[in-house]
Amino acid sequence: FAVLYRTNSQSRAIEDALRKKNIDYKIYGGISFYQRKEIKDLLSYLRMLINPNDEEALKRIINYPARGIGATTIDKLTIAANHYKKSIFDVIKNLDKIDLKINSGTKTKLQNFLNMILRFQIDMKKLNAFEVADLVIKQTKLVKDLEKDGTPEAVSKVENVQELLNGIKDFITDKIEEGEDASLTAFLEEVALATDLDADKKDDKLRVSLMSIHQSKGLEYPYVYVVGLEENLFLRQ
């Protein structure tokens, strides 16, 4: 079986649906929706709000979009965290007590990053998961950073970010209807499970193939499903 779509962002809904039905799939000539860089970047921001001690997430976003916090500063933060047996986030919170031997400009940038995360955590208490993600995108100017290249790839990345927002909105709707937890934490747990399942898949197992129309050229399958046959979306008018 093969499922074809026009844009890569359309794979999110298909992947989620197949996963819920325990149907194995593979992304032909590409990577899973939740493994795409722009998606992992936004998810890292959301993970930081739930657990500021998530150092993998912190290192991914502390200088993205670029805010002048370089690799040398991150190394100093890591060394200090190991020395004082604290998380990197705790080190940043205690810059007035820990001498990192950094200049005042860098210290200000770290303080601004800290304040941003703390503000998001406060806002998170009164917003749902979708609203939090939307706020993060706007306040960090993540989409603007993606758009600045002006390339087709940049457009695709922006579409992916928008599709993640759609996914969060769908998650909230489904969970509320089912009377289950619709929090940001619950969403991130579901994404983490999906990511783990993707990592466990073996190449030799029979799976549904997901791919864009462009990637399907020259390939043949007994059964082919084409999704998103909509005006202004599928090919050109």
Feature locations, PLM:
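A short beta-strand element within the Helicase C-terminal
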Residues: 40-44, 207-236
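Accessory C-terminal helicase-associated subdomains
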Residues: 65, 95-215, 236-237
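C-terminal helical "lid" of AAA+/P-loop NTPase domains
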Residues: 75-80, 93
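Conserved residues at beta->alpha junctions
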Residues: 5, 104, 228
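Conserved motor-region signature of P-loop NTPase helicases/translocases
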Residues: 1-59, 148-159, 166, 182-183, ...
